[in-house]
Amino acid sequence: MKALHFGAGNIGRGFIGKLLADAGVQLTFADVNQAVLDALNARGTYPVHVVGEQAQIEIVNGVNAVHSSSDDIIALIAEVDIVTTAVGPQILERIAAGMAQGIAKRSDNANSRPLNIIACENMVRGTTQLKAHVLKALPERYHAWLEEHVGFVDSAVDRIVPPSAADSSDPLEVTVETFSEWIVDKTQFKGEPPTIPGMELTDNLMAFVERKLFTLNTGHAIAAYLGQLAGHKTIREAIMDKKVRAIVQGAMEESGAVLIKRYGFAADKHAAYIQKIINRFENPYLIDDVERVGRQPLRKLSAGDRLIKPTLGTLEYHLPNNNLVTGIAAALLYRNEGDPQAIELAGLLSRQDVATTLVHISGLDKDSDVVKAVVKAVNALA
């Protein structure tokens, strides 16, 4: 089995690429970072530091790499069995044109073996969005062939992979936590789904997408925003602060009540899942910077993301949301001179009031109780 993985960054190398290579898949990375590409091609191998109670170094072997904008991409997509991505939601549209050219070539070559594409991004139904970009770039005469032979498989992914230490001299070295979860929608594959240890199949993906978004992502973001306000540098420092921890746990319990109503999760099992995530935030071996985790606050405050979406769920089911409201308020107060969205957010707040800014970003109703509650919480935190 052959695979092409877009994104040779930390998540690509430390999570999805590693699972594919460990499964014996012949793996090629695609990226734009020439230093990483050169190192992968020179060595064909790289170390992954898996950190937890039993820290270990695992070696990934038998990989190579190509530049994302090269014609190699077209030839590879024409022949591989799987394409995966870990590039960031905003980059999917950029890689769609090369994918479309590869799919056209695959059709021209009469290669009727199934091709399955899986976007492994922090977003809801990311592969479905990628498919829309690919269809836009693909001449219409190929659309029917694509529908017959190419599967676009949505997934939910979860593994904390912080950036490499600044003093690391190895461009391929990556550190990951022990925990990982990759869940894919088995109903969307063309042909038989591949057997890849660490990739779980489900026919109820949205339950797992929202479980992860409403718990790991919600908790991670709120820990970062409250942590920054409290002067903490890392997620571990933030979660060890009793005041921060109480709000983070409370927010995950509020979003969890939505999940239990919506998907019928067992309350005791979900409570254990929340505790597992808090334990992951406490991991002393992960240096997870609050400024990094808090980046892109405009995206994180949008209607379909980790703060507003669970809050909308609490309104739908008439459930409490005090801690989620505090988390939204903390997000509005996030400041980072190195993040364009944080700068834009600060600019919006300098020109207009909190309620107008929140409504503009999130789509919430300006006259709603929840917007009034966020304004009150911002004033209390500021």
Curated annotation (Swiss-Prot):
Keywords: NAD, Oxidoreductase
Catalytic activity entry: D-mannitol 1-phosphate + NAD(+) = beta-D-fructose 6-phosphate + NADH + H(+)
Enzyme Commission (EC) number: 1.1.1.17
Coiled-coil stretches: none
Name of the protein this chain belongs to: Mannitol-1-phosphate 5-dehydrogenase
SUPFAM superfamilies, A to Z: 6-phosphogluconate dehydrogenase C-terminal domain-like, NAD(P)-binding Rossmann-fold domains
Top EC class for this record: oxidoreductase
Residue positions binding NAD(+): A3, L4, H5, F6, G7, A8, G9, N10, I11, G12, R13, G14
Family per record: Belongs to the mannitol dehydrogenase family.
Any GO BP: mannitol catabolic process
InterPro entries found in the cross-reference section: 6-PGluconate_DH-like_C_sf, 6PGD_dom2, Mannitol_1_phos_5_DH, Mannitol_DH, Mannitol_DH_C, Mannitol_DH_CS, Mannitol_DH_N, NAD(P)-bd_dom_sf
Pfam family, one: Mannitol_dh_C
GO molecular function terms listed in the Swiss-Prot or TrEMBL record: mannitol-1-phosphate 5-dehydrogenase activity
GO cellular component entries: cytosol
Gene: mtlD
